[in-house]
A protein has these predicted regions:
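SAM-dependent transferase fold signal centered on methyltransferase-like domains
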Residues: 1-406
């Protein structure tokens, strides 16, 4: 079997215009080894043992129940993105595993055709079983190498409205294929789980995969996200595409970014550096790096090259928030979204209560109190979704310490 032999007809407004030769059915897993779980409104067949493994097993399909929150965010992000779209809606998932994300998209979002791909035949068989369990007719399966699958959707009029890639490790080797398969005005969603690389344990590997290097700080997760975004934006620019972040989210196991893709040259200059002073704690995102801290004159540490633009698009976040009542979604999503709306216009590089308290050798203030003090003194301030004790502000670090110590 040569895997995907699919194409979309030039006029693909009707469901019967989609043609795909799917891999044969080969499910050999005993039904006693399976469990049916429900995410949102979707039933998903999962091998019992797969839910216990920390890495994808080779002999059975992998499922990560801890990623449910990520899939919840995806559903409301995709729903918000597609809400006013009039052209045909096509969702592509290059590394679908058991198909949890694609199954939910096909079952919970209306008027969309879902194409999922994986190299694991057992995963695909379970994916097909789950599709039948949910009565899905808009769910199509491919067994192929990722870029071969995406190449079938890389021509004009044939691209995905939403393209998703969720690998175990770094997504870097798939990004060009994903970008080529994303339509003009489409959405690219990308996950990364190689946190040790992104957090500075393997800088050579980080430079190869993400075109930059991190530094270890209290806001290392923001640096990691900006490295991922910088890599995607740089690859897109080389293809004469403009990639713009509109939403990012994270937990302790992964980073996930969402970017709008336009088929036009990128004329922006938003790849730069984050500079951090170990002596005074000043930090900033800049296009041109400097050796010395502008506040205290000490040597600075530099992370990058990376994305120095905004992480969020406020209008899109508001639209996501409006979609929440339509779906069965974890309540944490609303809490996170409200924080992202508050921080969407704030500067890069958040602070944490503990780092300020440690620098002053005092007890931390409450997050609400420091934000109130900053605002009362004429500064902008907000919590951040990236850290429960983090806050963003345009206040200089020396003034933050002064207000903290009052």
């Amino acid at each position: 079997m040569d895997g995907l032999t699919a194409h979309l007809a030039p006029s693909h407004t009707r469901q019967d215009k989609y043609e795909m030769t799917e891999p044969p059915y080969r499910l050999q897993i005993n039904q006693d080894q399976l469990v049916t779980i429900i995410e949102g409104r979707t039933k998903i067949l999962v091998p019992k043992g797969a839910m216990e493994d920390k890495v994808p097993p080779r002999d059975i399909a992998f499922f990560n129940p801890r990623a449910r929150l990520s899939r919840d965010f995806s559903i409301i992000a995709y729903s918000a993105f597609l809400k006013d779209l009039e052209r045909p809606k096509i969702f592509l998932d290059g590394l679908s595993g058991l198909g949890a994300r694609g199954l939910r998209v096909a079952n919970e979002i209306s008027d969309i055709q879902v194409f999922v791909n994986d190299a694991n035949p057992k995963a695909l068989d379970l994916s097909r079983e789950s599709a039948e369990l949910n009565g899905l007719k808009n769910y199509h399966i491919s067994e192929n190498e990722v870029c071969r699958f995406l190449s079938a959707f890389s021509s004009e009029g044939n691209r995905g409205t939403i393209v998703d890639i969720d690998p175990f490790g770094s997504p870097s080797k798939y990004i060009e294929c994903c970008l080529r398969a994303t339509s003009h005005g489409g959405l690219l969603s990308v996950s990364a789980t190689d946190l040790q690389v992104l957090h500075g344990l393997f800088n050579d590997a980080c430079k190869k995969k993400y075109h930059g290097t991190p530094i270890k700080t209290t806001y290392s997760n923001e640096i990691a996200i900006r490295l991922i975004l910088g890599m995607i934006v740089t690859v897109a620019a080389r293809l004469d595409l403009e990639a713009t972040p509109i939403f990012v989210e994270t937990n302790q196991h992964y980073y996930r970014v969402y970017l709008r893709i336009l088929h036009k040259p990128d004329t922006r200059n938003l790849i730069g550096f984050i500079q951090h002073c170990r002596d005074c704690g000043n930090r900033c995102a800049v296009v041109e790096s400097a050796a010395k801290c502008k506040l205290c004159g000490s040597e600075q540490q530099t992370a990058g090259p990376l994305w120095v633009g905004t992480l969020y698009e406020k209008e899109f976040l508001t639209s996501m928030l409006a979609e929440l009542p339509k779906y069965t979604i974890d309540k944490k999503c609303e809490k996170t979204l409200r924080k992202t709306i508050l921080e969407s216009d704030m500067p890069a590089c958040y602070y944490t209560l503990d780092e300020i308290a440690e620098a002053l050798k005092t007890s931390p203030l409450s997050l609400q109190r420091i934000i109130e003090r900053l605002e009362q003194n004429g500064f902008a301030a907000s919590p951040t979704s990236l850290n429960p004790t983090g806050f963003r502000t345009n206040c200089p670090i020396d003034k933050i310490k002064e207000l903290f110590a009052q």
